[in-house]
Regions:
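Iron-sulfur cluster-binding cysteine motifs and their immediate structural context
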Residues: 2-8, 14-31, 35-37, 47-64
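Conserved SAM-binding loop
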Residues: 11, 45, 153-154
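Short, charged amphipathic alpha-helical surface segments
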Residues: 41-42
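Iron-sulfur-associated redox domains of electron-transfer enzymes in respiratory
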Residues: 54, 60-217
Length: 217
């Protein structure tokens, strides 16, 4: 049974993804945040949800080598990026090595994780989205599969990155410690709830404006 208290839950959804009996569903609160709901009749107490939960099990990330301040040299590309274009620059290098990128795309009233394997697809992932993006079970599966095949860059909030690293650790143990995962992660500043993002276009319409896009640079 999941032991994470509601006040400590980040809504990453990794417990629902990892549950072998599909006993956990992510349910949205009135504030717009996602929380796990456990079906006790399906739960077999395998404890896997507690092992992957980033609030209960913080993954070891080793020592920090150093800290850098970076900015893209290409000024044209920089204008379409945030945070100095650090994510874009790292992503370019990963693509040059035939890797895959996972980031968030803004679809107006919904944010979704999307995979990019080309510069054209990467362009859709640029720019900050100052709202929480719920990562789907499908996206978790695609990310883990990608790390097993080749170099993979994931941009996500610290809780989601921790969840992915916990999944890697569990899978590595299942495979006798021989599994090799090629993962690079990028952690932006945490976001507000997605409910505001969904309702904000309606608020703009009331002011006589229509929301077409939101960029944070």
């Amino acid at each position: 049974m999941l032991n994470c208290k509601k006040e400590n839950c980040t809504g990453c959804g990794v417990c629902a993804y990892s549950c072998p009996k599909s006993a956990i569903n992510m349910v949205e609160s009135v504030e717009g945040f996602l929380y796990p709901k456990v079906d006790r009749s399906l739960c077999v107490d395998c404890n896997l949800c507690n092992k992957v939960c980033p609030s209960l099990k913080k993954p070891s990330i080793g020592d920090f080598a150093d800290c850098y301040a970076v900015q893209l040299i290409n000024k044209t590309t920089l204008r379409h990026c945030a945070s100095g274009g650090a994510f874009y620059g790292i992503a370019q290098t990963v693509l040059e090595q035939n890797g895959a990128i996972f980031g968030v795309v803004d679809f107006g009233t919904e944010l979704r994780y999307q995979k990019a394997t080309s510069l054209k697809e990467l362009d859709e992932l640029t720019g900050s989205k100052y709202f929480q993006c719920a990562i789907s079970e499908k996206a978790y599966g695609e990310i883990i599969e990608s790390t097993q095949k080749g170099l993979t860059l994931v941009s996500g909030t610290p809780c989601m990155v921790a969840a992915i690293r916990n999944l890697q650790r569990i899978n590595r143990k299942k495979e006798g410690g021989h599994a090799h995962y090629q993962l690079i992660t990028s952690n932006p500043i945490n976001r507000p709830d997605p409910c505001f993002h969904r309702t904000s276009p309606a608020g703009l319409v009331l002011l006589g404006r229509k929301k077409s896009n939101a960029d944070f640079h």
